[in-house]
């Protein structure tokens, strides 16, 4: 497949030691040679070699920058095209001047994700691996990065391909049965079809069992801190983040809006939201914050309900318990450094079996227990780091669920003695749906949409 030559800055913009301008395409080496000056032309440099030289404007002979240039020839590159990486001095000016010179001499500015898109279109990676690259870039914890890295390496692709192969072999047997009915192989084929379908359904179930944990690792666990004003919600946020992100005072209603922060809790990424204290108020600004808090609460996957150890349970506290009925929650009784007035027995009754943790945030007590409770609530046996293949992408999860339904339709048809060619339709449908995960059968508009999520230069 032939493409034009593209270029982009592949390092983060801003001050730094090194900035890299990446080129990819059939003319990448020749184009770079137009602006490079070194001991010998880049076209004479062996593949996978880095050389020293200068980037020079050929029109004026002005030296733009002192550089190291990596020469990487197809097909042993990420895009399976010729690739040039110009290592410039970091900073906005030097890297942009080199990029502009390259663009002026024939390269096209790459679209977001276009390097990875070419790797996909040229068969270097499949679609699930490409999506793993996005997850790797966006990973918020080491565990999330490890899950993404396994996807980039093809762990999920291998699993999906093996399931598709099992279905394909089954379809092939069915077609032989249909084309050569004189061999009377229908009973054998139906038995085989049932066994294969049950095997594929079981393997899909195994993948879907990792979906909740995988999605949390990929997207973060939507966690909302709620409670009456001045019970220590903002102090809790600051303690978990290990920074002063929220204003902490003794004045009720200090937090008037929703504050959101990513937090790494024992390998679990939390999208932690500190809400305005939920109470009736005449303050217009605070009232808006309270309404936003109620909206955020509806979408939360985990609630951290904070109570005051030094105050009796109020009607507002009991109303909050009612508001989170049936939701995953941890109850935090804060301010154990003051005299106890709260009825902990009643708190545990209202918690209805959910964890109750006592803390004194000002004395840094109870935070370890809280973090352990959060991690165990969603990763009861810990976060697997071995051979587990996590499914973390919403698109993959939806396709696996659809493929499972198609397989179940086939099994139901077999039990009802439906003609074998009708059963084949469901099996083929499952095969196609699994193919969409790795990009074997997917619409071009979806491909464009997926790669548009990438940053420039990747």
Curated annotation (Swiss-Prot):
One of its GO terms (molecular function) is metal ion binding. It comes from Halalkalibacterium halodurans (strain ATCC BAA-125 / DSM 18197 / FERM 7344 / JCM 9153 / C-125) (Bacillus halodurans). It is an enzyme of class 3 (hydrolase). Pfam families: MMR_HSR1, MnmE_helical, TrmE_N. This is tRNA modification GTPase MnmE. GO terms for biological process: tRNA methylation; tRNA wobble uridine modification. Residues 220-379 form the TrmE-type G domain. Exhibits a very high intrinsic GTPase hydrolysis rate. Involved in the addition of a carboxymethylaminomethyl (cmnm) group at the wobble position (U34) of certain tRNAs, forming tRNA-cmnm(5)s(2)U34. Its main location: cytoplasm. It comes from the Bacteria. Homodimer. Heterotetramer of two MnmE and two MnmG subunits. Its cofactor is K(+). Belongs to the TRAFAC class TrmE-Era-EngA-EngB-Septin-like GTPase superfamily. TrmE GTPase family. Mg(2+) binds at residues 234, 255. InterPro entries: G_TrmE, GTP-bd, GTP-bd_TrmE_N, GTPase_MnmE, MnmE_dom2, MnmE_helical, P-loop_NTPase, Small_GTP-bd. Keywords: Cytoplasm, GTP-binding, Hydrolase, Magnesium, Metal-binding, Nucleotide-binding, Potassium, tRNA processing. (6S)-5-formyl-5,6,7,8-tetrahydrofolate binds at residues 22, 85, 124, 458. Its EC number is 3.6.-.-. It is found in: Cytoplasm. PANTHER family: TRNA MODIFICATION GTPASE GTPBP3 (PTHR42714), TRNA MODIFICATION GTPASE GTPBP3, MITOCHONDRIAL (PTHR42714:SF2). SUPFAM superfamilies: P-loop containing nucleoside triphosphate hydrolases, TrmE connector domain.
